[in-house]
Amino acid sequence: GLNRPSKRCLAGSAPCEFHKRSTCCSGHCIIWWCA
């Protein structure tokens, strides 16, 4: 997927609200999924 660190987040939290398909990875929101 696209690895784009964006806003910070907590691992295991709900998907980031700024993008429906973003995922929390390594403390940051990335689009799609963790590499």
From Swiss-Prot:
UniProt subcellular location: Secreted
A GO MF label: toxin activity
Main localization of the protein described in the UniProt heading: secreted
Transmembrane segments: none
Keyword match Secreted: yes
Coiled-coil region: none
Gene Ontology annotations for the cellular component aspect, listed alphabetically: extracellular region
Tissue: Expressed by the venom duct.
Disulfide bonds: C9-C25, C16-C29, C24-C34
Keywords, comma-separated and alphabetical: Cleavage on pair of basic residues, Disulfide bond, Ion channel impairing toxin, Knottin, Neurotoxin, Secreted, Toxin
Reported function: Probable neurotoxin with unknown target. Possibly targets ion channels.
Domain-related comment: The presence of a 'disulfide through disulfide knot' structurally defines this protein as a knottin. The cysteine framework is VI/VII (C-C-CC-C-C).
Family of this protein: Belongs to the conotoxin O1 superfamily.
Record-given protein name: Conotoxin Cal6.1c
